[in-house]
């Protein structure tokens, strides 16, 4: 059983303990209205606040592949540093067992920053989209590898219908074909194989060649450590990047945000 299979099995157990509730576009829209609306996640990536790439900076304490990434973990402080440094959006891990995330982190960060937020988790049930709104997310991650076509379309329609952005994540050509069938405007290519957790940055370029990039905002995810990595991915067609581990390992998070985002090259930090 792969790590991904284990994570999904755990999610199924967690969801089995929750009350059964119907989730509709109308119920989700009512939730969004009650909390005061949505920050536009996709628009924030298309028009970066700083630098030359839409940067989704991830708040992540641990992962199955890396273990504890940041022992001195203060999610709100990290989120505020990301925002101040110019990140376009934030990704917040809410999975507790495998990534040491928490719904509370998302709630707290919602109150502390003004940029759009992604609930980073393994969505296999419509109730998780309702949770995402309740906890403060403006976008949800839909991982094609763990959803059949019917659920993928259902969850995409629910999220987008409610006004959220849906980041549809793929890793290979077969998954990309399924995402394209949705006409998803926001597609993430995960350079990490979630079955083996190995990373290959060339994955983004290979799959980007199959996309109409005038109709799709492409996000490159995983394995991004240097500005050279970012420029390689931009040349492949990525307009945005999602970065977690390499930011979390920095003593000076803000400087790394500026470096990856291109601010130290094109922006005010030109002499750094």
Name every feature range the model reports, one short phrase each.
Residues 10, 58-62, 95, 122, ...:
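Active-site beta-loop-alpha junctions enriched in small/polar residues
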Residues 12, 86-87, 137, 184, ...:
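A structural motif
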Residues 53-54, 59, 65-167, 175-178, ...:
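N-terminal active-site wall of soluble small-molecule enzyme domains
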Residues 124-135, 171-182, 220, 224-243:
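Catalytic cores of alpha/beta
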Residues 131-151, 188-197, 238-256:
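Glycine-rich phosphate-binding active-site loops on the catalytic face of alpha/beta enzymes
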Residues 186-243:
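Catalytic-face loop-and-helix region of soluble metabolic enzyme cores
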Residues 206-210, 249-272:
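C-terminal helical cap(s) of enzyme catalytic domains, especially alpha/beta-barrels
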């Amino acid at each position: 059983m792969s790590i991904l299979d284990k994570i999904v099995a755990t999610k199924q157990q967690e969801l089995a303990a929750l009350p059964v509730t119907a989730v509709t576009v109308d119920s989700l829209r009512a939730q969004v209205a009650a909390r005061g609306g949505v920050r536009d996640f996709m628009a924030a990536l298309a028009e970066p606040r700083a630098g030359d790439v839409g940067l989704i900076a991830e708040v992540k304490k641990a992962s199955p592949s890396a273990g504890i990434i940041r022992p001195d973990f203060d999610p709100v402080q990290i989120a505020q540093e990301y925002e101040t440094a110019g990140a376009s959006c934030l990704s917040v891990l809410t999975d507790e067992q495998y990534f040491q995330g928490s719904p509370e982190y998302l709630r707290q960060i919602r109150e502390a920053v003004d940029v759009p937020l992604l609930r980073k988790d393994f969505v296999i049930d419509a109730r998780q989209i309702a949770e995402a709104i309740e906890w403060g997310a403006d976008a949800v991650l839909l991982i094609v590898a763990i959803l059949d076509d019917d659920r993928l379309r259902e969850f995409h329609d629910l999220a987008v219908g409610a006004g959220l952005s849906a980041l549809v994540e793929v890793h290979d050509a077969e998954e990309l074909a399924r995402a394209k069938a949705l006409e998803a405007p926001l597609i993430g290519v995960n350079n990490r194989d979630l079955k083996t957790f190995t990373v290959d940055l060339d994955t983004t370029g290979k799959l980007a060649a199959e996309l109409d990039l005038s109709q799709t905002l492409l996000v490159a995810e995983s394995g991004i450590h240097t500005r050279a990595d970012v420029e390689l991915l931009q040349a492949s067609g990525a307009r945005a990047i999602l970065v977690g581990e390499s930011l979390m390992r920095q003593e000076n998070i803000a400087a790394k945000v500026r470096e990856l985002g291109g601010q130290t090259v094109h922006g005010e930090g030109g002499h750094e």
